[in-house]
Amino acid sequence: MNRGLLLSSDVKSRCWPWASSYPRSEVQAPVLTDPVWQFVPWLEFARRELNAGRLPLWNPHQNGGVPFLGNAQSAIASPLFAPALLLGVERGWNLSLLLRILVAAVGMYLWLRDVERSRAAATLGALMFSISGPSIAWLEHPISMVIASIPILLLLARRLAREHSGAGFAGVAVATYLVLAGGHPETAAMAVAVVAGATALEAHGWRPRVRTALAACVGVLLAAPLLVPFAEYLSLSAAAQGEDRAVFTLSVSALGRFIVPHATTGNPITEASTVSVVGLCLALFGLGHIRRSRQVRYWAGVAFLIVVVSYDNPVSRLLALHTPLYWTRSLILLPLALGFLAATGLDSLRSLAKRRLGERSAMLAASALVVMAGAELLAAARGVHAVTPPEDVDPTTPLLRRLTTESEPFRILPLHTFLPPDSATALGLDDVRGYDAITPRAWLREREAMGRFTSTNIVTDVLEPRNLAPGGRALDLWNVKYLLLHPQLPYTAERLNSEFGLDLEEIYLGSDGRLLRNRRVLPRARLRGEGTVHVTERRATRWRLDVDARESTVLVLANPMFPGWRARVDGKRAPIASRTGTPIEVRVSAGRHTVEISYEPLSFRLGAGMCVAALFVLGMIVWRIGWS
């Protein structure tokens, strides 16, 4: 981390418009591009909105406009993301990653100490969990924030199940929030299920189980401002219908990565599994307690189930085909189970050594095994992530500078792999494409009128020039003013006009790309009848328009409708008749009007109300039963 930011920004040397000017070298981590194309642009957008005093509820720069807080993976409400959110990418990104590792290690150590493992065994488990192959591989992704918080939840849930206190109740609620706010609901659900099983095993009687479950429910309510908008967005997404879902399991040959972490076959991220050979052997030794210990049986069962649902077999194939979850993601939970088993195995081995060699020799041997496991894991972690100098995170080009200086509302349509989806979010440009786990289903249907979108090996959501729809009417209606493409592609304005009936003119050609202007583009805000519209205020979640209509007509704002958008004409609520995914339309009478169109999602307000109620309930419970 001292050499630069753990980011694969060097992938931009293979993508336009940066390819001609970005320092060209071999891409260090070609599969770790999601942070570059998704998470960093989202972070920069969130910082812009928060610095302006606005909640980043809506992202106008992706897929025509989509919920931002509701996409879950933005993860801006997680304390583990706070360093990056407060300090920016250059100063805060690595701090956020380091914080995730530290929280995971400390939480795992404290939990293992609480279940009566020795210091050496707890240290071993902490290393196996916090710097395991899966933890390091997914470190730049939001999923790592979910995983880092699990041992803390295990620790506090175990204590609450054994001793009733206000502090314990509040601790479980807050730890549950940390897991849910991490930015990966799929993994969070798996984690909560694992913690629930472990807690039920520890609790004696139904009362401890009920109070622990109630505390977790309060934690769910604390996260409601994130979960309720996510549920709404998911219900309207293509993902809810299983569209574009990759159905896969991990090859059985990928089990070799437990022994050889840098094997060259398969995907080095999804298949990452090493917990060190030392740790794996100690975990197998810990299975010797499987008959005597319910805890060992439970965590051995968890490890077995994770392997079964992740690696190729009839069960995993059935789950992959017929359920909406990516079960291979559960592999990131495996170091938790193996860490517990290895800690148990180390203490068992130490007890045997103590009887034969004495206390001091047994302690030295245990410490040596911990050091060996840590060294093995650190060696395996080297080279997983790329290192980017801070000055290379946000390179710009003449073409991009030209676009970002234009003040009027417009959309762009990069063709082929030019400016990969979501990159526009960092630049403040409105793109019709997007790259996200969930995408509005209705918008994808509307967008088909622009052309046939596909994917390539390196970029998702691609419109090739040859796949443009004839006529270009959808480009005009949706305010797509500029088409961007590689300078070496043989598609000039004249050729596209001739082949597809467009009306484009080339206004820029440089080493960084070709910029074509759509001369037929319609304004973002316009009237169907005669009159004028002036945009006086434009924010992510609010538009203010001065309208002068000569007759009763319809005001069209060419942004895709989504639940939560509201309209007011001269301060009075006005109906929006548009269907989800179609342009926002508001009827106005003849004359001058001030129209405000704002995003006020009921889902967020409902979630915020649930959060406030949870805080009140939490305060009352702590006050009633006392803190300690």
Task: List the model feature ranges, each with a label.
Residues 11, 15-18, 248, 371, ...:
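Extracytoplasmic
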Residues 12-50, 54, 216-289, 316, ...:
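Periplasmic/ER-lumenal interhelical loops and adjacent helix-loop junctions
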Residues 275-297, 304, 308, 354, ...:
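Hydrophobic, aromatic-rich transmembrane alpha-helices
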Residues 2-3, 50, 81-91, 120-141, ...:
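Membrane-interface helix-loop junctions at the exits of transmembrane helices
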Residues 115, 158-169, 200-211, 288-294, ...:
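Membrane-interface junctions at the ends of membrane-embedded or membrane-associated helices
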Residues 2-115, 120-149, 261-267, 578:
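Active-site lumenal/periplasmic loops and adjacent helix-entry segments of GT-C-fold
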Residues 105-114, 119-203, 212-230, 236, ...:
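Membrane-embedded helix bundles of polyisoprenyl
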